[in-house]
Design a protein with these regions (language model features):
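Hydrophobic cores of alpha-helical transmembrane segments in multi-pass integral membrane proteins
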Residues: 2-10, 15-43, 47-121
Length: 121
């Protein structure tokens, strides 16, 4: 009895789950944006510029998490000689790069009103 997942089986199961995950992500995104930008009070020292943090921190965490998962998937792919692990690692790369880009520039846009400069390092 084999416990490995074939590519065809993975694509079939992933295809069935995509609409559910996309719906949940959209609902959570809308709720998060509403709470972060309209419900939270104005911060005493930073004013409204602190609201950028509601985009910056999740993007940075997601980028780091995706890069860690890419490394794990690549190691699994090397150890188990699994094409699926390499496909998963390759699929995570564009999203990790996008989240890294968002984190980098949202941090700069937060730094400008907070520190008076886009970059401190």
């Amino acid at each position: 009895m084999s416990t490995s997942i074939t590519l065809e089986g993975f694509y079939r199961k992933a295809g069935m789950l995509i609409p559910w995950f996309m719906s949940a992500a959209l609902v959570l995104f809308i709720v998060g944006v509403y709470l972060g930008f309209f419900v939270c009070p104005i911060e005493a020292r930073q004013g409204n510029s602190y609201r950028i943090i509601f985009i910056h921190i999740p993007a940075a965490w997601l980028a780091m998490s995706l890069y860690l998962l890419m490394a794990v998937a690549s190691i699994v792919g090397l150890l188990k000689n699994s094409r699926l692990a390499f496909i998963l690692a390759q699929a995570m790369a564009p999203t990790g790069a996008l989240m890294g880009f968002i984190a980098l520039f949202s941090g700069a846009f937060w730094g400008r009103p907070t520190w008076g400069t886009y970059w401190v390092w």
